[in-house]
Amino acid sequence: MKKFLYLTIAALALVACGDDDHEENNPPQEKQYTKLVTRANMDISQELLNIADITVYYMNEAGEVVNERMTSPVLEKTVTQPIPCKTGMAVTFTVKPDLNPTAEEKFDIKYSGKLTTTPYTKNNDPGAMLNKVFGLDLKGVRGDKLAETLSHHTTKIAYTYTADGKQADTSIQWGF
């Protein structure tokens, strides 16, 4: 009986003394990201849409800057790009050419938006999501200050992504 007990203890000791170095020899692999999904959303007040030409700039699937005019109060865009890449969004506001506001007129400028970026591996495993929220809510902007106010509230968001999923602020030549 003692012999059986000693053999059991010896067997357990051998198992317990196994190679614990396997983690040092095989460090965990960093995830490699292959694509970036960018979602842009904007909500514009009807009053702002009536008084301003609003142009949205963004990076397309090929990494080129494209733009479009907002003609409705809601914008939703989803773009998928290969990583490494640059992504982002810019929004410009200019007073409509046929609008000649006076100092006595008052305008409310209201918009909100969100840019969400998520990197994915080739197996579609998502990495860290980044949300950038922006917007403006100004009440009673005088008509004679409208153009100046709108020009000071251009939105520019730009990021670069690398294959290891790291994101950094960058600059993009938007073309305006």
Please give the residue ranges for each predicted region.
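First exposed extracellular module after export/assembly in secreted or surface-exposed proteins
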Residues: 26-176
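Bacterial Sec-dependent N-terminal signal peptides
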Residues: 4-40
